[in-house]
Amino acid sequence: MIENQSDNIDNKENDLSDQDNALENVSSAQELTTENNELSSQKTEEINTEELKNSISNNDARLEQLEKEHETLKNQYVRISADFDNFRKRQSRDQDDLKIQLVSKTLTAILPIVDNFERARQQLKPESEEAQSLHRSYQGLYKQLVEVLKQQGVSPMRVVGQQFDPSLHEAVLREPSEKFEEDFIIEELQRGYHLEGKVLRHALVKVSMGPGKQNSQEEVEKDKVEGDIDSEENTSEDV
């Protein structure tokens, strides 16, 4: 009986020992699992950090590439915009030049008519009332023609007393002069005209060969006054 009890006690002790071993094994397993989890978590963090670094590096490279592409496209846009602006300006100039050429061609054909009116005004001296009335009618037409030319941007050249300029004047005659120095214009033989600042028709002029003095200031003022009076009377100086 006592032996049986002793065996039971031994068995219980063995069971307790087994339980303790089992608990120790469980605890060791838990610790190992925890360590594994920590290692796994650390490794995962390292992997994530590396991936993040790679992603940032890739994004930086992509950003740099996009910035270069943006700069390239920007430069292309600036060049295209400048080319288009130059093209637009060139087209505008070409259109203006074409317009001036067409207007010049028409006005150049009209100028001989103006010359005829001016010659008639200078040469004809109507005496009878009927002739004077007819002359006034012609002069009325002449004034209308002059006004049309002014509206188109036509202006006359003032040449007498000016130094000869081949870009503006055409020398038909040259003669000595005591009044004007060499290469100064003595007389206007056919009026020259400008159109919008450009030469519409060169003035035909008589040029001094010298010797002589250039017009004194008093003579210049006198010629200017006489020209203004002639302009007021005949309006031909207003073209």
UniProtKB/Swiss-Prot annotation:
What's an example GO BP annotation here? protein folding
Q: Which Pfam families match?
A: GrpE
- The segment annotated Disordered runs over 1-54, 208-239
Concerning InterPro entries, the annotation shows: GrpE, GrpE_coiled_coil, GrpE_head
GO MF terms, alphabetically ordered? adenyl-nucleotide exchange factor activity; protein homodimerization activity; protein-folding chaperone binding; unfolded protein binding
- Polar residues biased stretches: 19-42
Give a GO cellular-component term: cytoplasm
Family matches, as SUPFAM superfamilies: Coiled-coil domain of nucleotide exchange factor GrpE, Head domain of nucleotide exchange factor GrpE
Q: Where is the composition biased (Basic and acidic residues)?
A: 43-53
The answer to keyword 4Fe-4S applying to this record is no
- Renumbered to this chain, the Acidic residues biased-composition regions fall at 228-239
Principal place where this protein is found?
cytoplasm
UniProt-annotated location(s)? Cytoplasm
UniProtKB keywords? Chaperone, Cytoplasm, Stress response
- Describe its partners and assembly state: Homodimer.
Task performed by this protein: Participates actively in the response to hyperosmotic and heat shock by preventing the aggregation of stress-denatured proteins, in association with DnaK and GrpE. It is the nucleotide exchange factor for DnaK and may function as a thermosensor. Unfolded proteins bind initially to DnaJ; upon interaction with the DnaJ-bound protein, DnaK hydrolyzes its bound ATP, resulting in the formation of a stable complex. GrpE releases ADP from DnaK; ATP binding to DnaK triggers the release of the substrate protein, thus completing the reaction cycle.
- Family under the similarity heading: Belongs to the GrpE family.
Q: What is this protein called?
A: Protein GrpE
Gene source species:
Prochlorococcus marinus (strain AS9601)
* Gene designation: grpE
